[in-house]
Structures are given as structure tokens and as C-alpha cells.
Amino acid sequence: MRYGGWLIAAAMVAAPAAAKDRLGVYQSWAAFRDAETPRCYAIAAPEETVGSATRKAYLSIGFWPRSGVSHQIYVRLSRERSTNSVITLSAGGRRFRLKGEGSNGWATDRRMDLAIIAAMRSATSLSVESIGRDGRSIVDAYALRGAPSAIDAAALGCVPK
């Protein structure tokens, strides 16, 4: 699998040094469980990035059962964005304006999280776009092959036993 190394690297960046259980690798996506926190997440690295990346970008869907949080979208851009620029996620013909801080982006609320995931389930690719501090476009493109399976594995991985 072409993205295996990226997925593992992205997962390591996404989580503290706590032990993680790999729930599965699904084409360009993977699912992990961190039993100590506890939390589970589906994660992928971009298939393509426009321009030179200054950090490892990734997109994740997180589940935090103790906090009552599920299906939470999180994106880390490949470069630091301009303070005044928006972060736009596009999937399946739909566009979503994320809230952002630095190179990080989140859905504005649970309704948007679920709408993004619904769009992901019916699309083949997803892009996250913004403007970098240098004034150049940031475009991180993700393949969605395996995303539904990884999201489902992460959701099931955090169901209380």
C-alpha cells in the first residue's frame, strides 16, 4: 500500500506517545484506538499537495467516548495559513467553511461534522483549501477509497464493551 508509511506517521503526529491499537488499514485510510485516553480515529494523509509542504498534513475523524464526542472532523494543513484566509473543505460537490486556528481546521458544529462525513461517503476525493502565509494557495487532496470503512472501524472501536 502506497500510503502505509504516511498513515503511520500521521497517526504518530496526531496522538501523544500513548499506545495505539491499529484497528485496520483500508486502502488510503487507517483506523486506530488509543485505549488510555480513550479515543479512536480514522486518518489519512493527502494523496496530493499543491506546493511545498512544511508539515505533514492529515485529515481525521475522531471519537472521544468519555467526552461524548463522535464523528469530529479535524484537518491539519500542509502549510501555515494566512490569518485572514478561510479553510474550505470540498467533497461530493459540497463545500464547507471550517473554523481554523493556525494550520488546523474543524467543522463548526456536529451538524457540519455529519454533513461532511455524509459527503465523504458518496465522493471519491476531498480537497482542503486555504491561502498560505506566503500568499500562495494551499490545496491538500485526499482519496476517499477506504474512508467509510475506516470511519466505521473507528466508531466501533470506541463502543463501550
Describe each model-derived feature in a short phrase.
Residues 2-9:
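Sec-dependent signal peptide recognition
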Residues 14-16:
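N-terminal signal peptide c-region/cleavage motif recognized by signal peptidases
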Residues 19-161:
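A generic "folded-domain core" signal
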